[in-house]
């Protein structure tokens, strides 16, 4: 195991590590953010890069946080995923290469996409804490 992996194992919970580093999936409806309605942004649990906004979050009924789009499409990578006998599109964070979840073509809105993301891959920054946490420029998303 590399030194970087050892550091991540210390930093992350076992579930966060399994999801982000081993392409795991947390249980639906039993995760931290699937029903969170507070305003704020969701950042990569590994790198801290802003990924999704509560403005683009909606209840898809699937049991995981669902978003219509990322804050910045340049910060996510989409890859073909044929695991488990399915054809899906995996979503990974660009900077940390963390497994985030999958994107499906069954969402609402103009792009018709549903980013189905594991809570364990994210950290939520409430709108009130954006400045304090170093994400002040994202307050404009909520004006």
Swiss-Prot record:
Keywords: Oxidoreductase. Gene3D superfamilies: Peptide methionine sulfoxide reductase. One of its GO terms (biological process) is protein repair. This is Peptide methionine sulfoxide reductase MsrB. InterPro entries: Met_Sox_Rdtase_MsrB, Met_Sox_Rdtase_MsrB_dom, Mss4-like_sf. It catalyses: L-methionyl-[protein] + [thioredoxin]-disulfide + H2O = L-methionyl-(R)-S-oxide-[protein] + [thioredoxin]-dithiol. The keyword Oxidoreductase applies. Residues 5-127 form the MsrB domain. Signal peptide: none annotated. Its EC number is 1.8.4.12. The active site is at residue 116. The gene is msrB. The lineage of its organism: Bacteria, Bacillati, Bacillota, Bacilli, Bacillales.
């Amino acid at each position: 195991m590399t030194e970087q992996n050892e550091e991540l194992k210390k930093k992350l919970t076992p579930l966060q590590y399994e999801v982000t580093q081993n392409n795991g999936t947390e249980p639906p409806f039993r995760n931290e953010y699937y029903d969170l309605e507070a305003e704020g942004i969701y950042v990569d649990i590994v790198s801290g890069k802003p990924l999704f906004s509560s403005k683009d979050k909606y209840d898809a009924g699937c049991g995981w946080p669902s978003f219509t789009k990322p804050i910045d499409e340049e910060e996510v990578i989409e890859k073909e995923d044929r695991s488990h006998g399915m054809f899906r599109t995996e979503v990974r964070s660009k900077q940390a290469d963390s497994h985030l979840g999958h994107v499906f073509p069954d969402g609402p809105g103009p792009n018709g996409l549903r980013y189905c993301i594991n809570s364990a891959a994210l950290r939520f920054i409430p709108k009130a804490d954006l400045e304090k946490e170093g994400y002040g420029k994202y307050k404009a998303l909520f004006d």
